[in-house]
A protein has these predicted regions:
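Mid-to-C-terminal alpha-helical segments outside catalytic/metal-binding sites
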Residues: 1-8, 13, 72-73, 220-226, ...
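Short, conserved catalytic or adaptor-binding loops enriched in Gly and charged residues
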Residues: 46-49, 186-188, 217-218, 243-244
Length: 264
């Protein structure tokens, strides 16, 4: 963090049943917790080691009967400020999810969701593909059903919709110039409670595939875009800093918008 001038960051969980994530994660994550690849206990551990560096997030699976009770307790005991990252094989307008989202709205927690479409892996076991969220339409229904809740879209199935083409359900990282009229753009203009998380290969790819459009996009939605990483390198900063954006715009994306959603 110090190397890349990051003073503070949101620290997110990934709670997910064992049959809903790719076993290849065993190669890069110590899966010692029954609740998923990035359990809340691990985030608490890092927060306790450096409380000034982290804003604590937690996203219990809303299908669990005790999910809201667990989140409420985490807010009261550990000071959780963000509900994220939600990355599950469920439709995000599932009634249990909507109930959780509305609770987050009441508590002032922004909700971060990951979307992936069905890309065939060439395998049958344990799953032929790894879809999450049910696509952009299910996410839009959730946003519309919970107007008092702030949502942050994230992941390949979200960022592919920056362009109005047919690549979103064919490849995780679409290429080529952005075609005007993308679903993501329409939704950002229509729903004031929708924000976007620039992290990961998907967020970076959405910008780098068309740098000219990226500059226009970042300026238009400068009040609702949040810098994130998901990477150990500095690719996101390097690209953002190369676009000639004003310091005012960069300050909002790097820190201002996050502080607006989760004030210190």
């Amino acid at each position: 963090m110090a190397e890349y001038n990051i003073d503070k960051t949101w620290l997110l969980t990934w709670e997910c049943p064992a049959d809903e994530y790719d076993p290849e994660y065993y190669n890069c994550v110590s899966l010692s917790d029954q609740w998923g690849p990035i359990p809340f206990s691990r985030c608490v551990h890092y927060k306790e080691r450096a409380p000034e560096k982290f804003v604590l997030g937690y996203a219990p699976d809303p299908r669990r009967p005790d999910a809201i009770d667990r989140l409420r307790a985490a807010i009261e005991i550990y000071g959780v400020r963000v509900y994220g990252e939600l990355k599950l094989r469920m439709m995000y307008d599932n009634p249990d999810a909507l109930r959780m989202f509305r609770f987050c709205g009441e508590k002032g927690l922004p909700v971060i969701v990951h979307i992936d479409y069905e890309f065939e892996t060439g395998r049958k076991y344990p799953r032929p593909n790894w879809w999450y969220g049910g696509g952009i339409d299910a996410f839009e229904r959730a946003i519309r059903a919970c107007p008092a809740t702030i949502f942050l879209g994230h992941g390949p199935g979200f960022w592919a919709h920056i362009s109005n083409d047919d690549q979103f359900d064919k490849v995780a990282y679409p290429t080529g110039k952005v075609v005007p009229g993308g679903k993501l753009i329409q939704m950002l203009r229509r729903y004031p409670n929708l924000y976007a998380d620039l992290s990961g290969g998907s967020g970076l790819n959405a910008l780098k595939r068309d740098p000219e459009f990226a500059g226009e996009f970042l300026i238009e939605f400068q009040d609702r875009l949040l810098y994130g990483r998901d990477y150990f390198d500095n690719s996101h900063q390097e690209f953002l800093n190369s676009l000639g954006l004003s310091q005012e715009v960069l300050s909002k994306i790097y820190a201002g918008n996050a502080l607006k959603l989760v004030p210190e």
